[in-house]
Every structure is written in C-alpha cells, then in structure tokens.
C-alpha cells in the first residue's frame, strides 16, 4: 500500500492503471485512467472508459497532467491517494483521489 508521495512517484510508470474515486469534477469519478508519462513535475494520464479523444490528445498525446505539488497537499489512506489544492484537505479543495490498480 502506498503511504507517501515518494512511494507513489516510484510506483507510477507508463501503463499503470488508476481508478478515480474522487475528483473536483464529479463527472470524472469512476474513470479508469492509464499513466502515459511520469516526470519530476507530475504524471500524465489518458482516460480509458470511455476514451475522450480531446483530453487524451492533450500535451502532445500524453493526456491530462496532474502536478505533484508539495507532499503536504497529499493524503494516503486505505489505498487511496488524494491530491489537494492546499494543506486544508477538504472535499472543496480536492483535485483528484485515485486508487492504483493491480498494486503489488
């Protein structure tokens, strides 16, 4: 189980799949996403179900990006990784919450 941002960064590689469990846009909850690119700035993902050609073509075909931000703006509970706008960590400041699938 992922317990901190460093572990998450090491775990996410191209091909890793994520299930969105919370999002600032309610329509994104339940999406299945696949990591396409990871760097020191953030992680790029494409939407798998149903594919969204507009979003998946963004950033030179890498999909949408979620910036890493500060470790203090993340929480890790019960296998769910959550990124927030700031350290407040409320439903109003949630950017995205997700579960890494087929986690070892």
Q: What are the functions of these language-model segments?
A:
Residues 50-104:
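Intrinsically disordered, low-complexity, charged/polar segments
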């Amino acid at each position: 189980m992922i317990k901190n941002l460093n572990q998450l960064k090491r775990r996410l590689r191209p091909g890793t799949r994520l299930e969105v469990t919370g999002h600032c846009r309610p329509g994104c909850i339940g999406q299945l996403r696949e990591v396409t690119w990871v760097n020191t700035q953030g992680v790029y993902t494409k939407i798998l179900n149903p594919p969204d050609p507009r979003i998946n073509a963004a950033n030179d075909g890498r999909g949408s990006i979620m910036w890493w931000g500060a470790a203090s703006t993340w929480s890790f509970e019960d296998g769910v990784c959550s990124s927030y706008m700031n350290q407040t960590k409320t439903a109003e400041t949630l950017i995205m919450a997700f579960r890494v699938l087929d986690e070892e």
